[in-house]
Structures are given as structure tokens and as C-alpha cells.
């Protein structure tokens, strides 16, 4: 039985709640001592993990819609992607304001360059910013064939973000490995498309070097 448009609308409502409830929990934890001994790190890790969850959920939609024969599920993909960007922005903001502090924001650029895991993080965020900004149907029409080329960069984020997470923790625990494994699995489901994109990129580079 296929989902109807009305059911997908209610599913979107549930997904919005799924994006909002972690924020409400975090606000409660901050105000009621629900965080650990290092609340700043806890906030950074929580916001980062939540962004990663929404990234993985976004990547899950296409194969799920295909294998479950639920084409209308695709309508939830943009919503999940925007929540991913929102939580990634909270993650970046928590680092800038809580780790560095308002008086040391001038150091942000230096930190992003000198710490490789932060470099991967900011590259991922910039890509997500571009994808969020161009996610509307109006931008899709305006960009034409270039829209899909741009949005294929989500696969690069799926590689960089788990590495950023693994690199940022001092002690490797099962959790970041699980996220990395899920990202690899979701990318593996698209191996034909990724191989095609890689071959196209290699051909373009070869043509430019041959000039």
C-alpha cells in the first residue's frame, strides 16, 4: 500500500517534531543540569550528532523510497536536509560562541585552518549552506542541470562529516564508528551513481590537463 499525499503531510509534521524535540531537550538539560562535567563539549557533540543523524536520514530517503516502492517519500527529503543544516549551524555556533567565546571570534578563521578536523567540518557546513539555499523549486528551475550537480556534493558531506566526528573525539568509541559505518552503507547503496560521478570528474580533470 502506497503512502498518500495526506499521509506524507502528517509524516512531515512528525519529522518537524523530530527536528524540534532535541532542541527542547537540550534547552531543558542546559537549564536543569542535565549535561555532564563538560557541558560545552556535551552541547557541541549533541548538536553535531543530531546534524549527522539528519544527514543520514536524508540519505536514507532515496533508497527507502525506491526499495519500498513509496515514491512520495521523496517529498520528505528536503525537510530532513534543512533540519540537518539547522543542526549543523547550531553545532558551528556552539563551537564559536561557547568554545572560543564572543571575545575570541577573531580566532575562528585561524582555528578552522590549523585544525584539520575543523577544516573538514567547515567545508561540510559551507556545502550544506549552499544546498539549503538552493533547495527550493524556484532555485531548481533557475539552476537547471547544474542544480543536480551541486546537490551531488551531499555525498562529499557524507564522507567528510563522519571523519570530522571521528577526528574530533579524543577516544574512539563505538558511537562515531557506527555513524561512519552507516554513512559508508548509504553511500555503498549508490555505488553505481558515485562511480559514474567519479568517472565524469576524472574525465573533466583529464581534459583540462590536456589543454
Curated annotation (Swiss-Prot):
Protein name per its UniProtKB record: Protein-methionine-sulfoxide reductase heme-binding subunit MsrQ
Gene expressing this chain: msrQ
Membrane spanning residue stretches: 10-30, 82-102, 116-136, 153-173, 178-198
GO biological process, one term: protein repair
InterPro entries noted in UniProt: Fe3_Rdtase_TM_dom, MsrQ-like
Membrane topology: Multi-pass membrane protein
Complex formation: Heterodimer of a catalytic subunit (MsrP) and a heme-binding subunit (MsrQ).
Cofactor binding note: Binds 1 FMN per subunit. Binds 1 heme b (iron(II)-protoporphyrin IX) group per subunit.
UniProt GO molecular function: electron transfer activity; FMN binding; heme binding; metal ion binding; oxidoreductase activity, acting on diphenols and related substances as donors
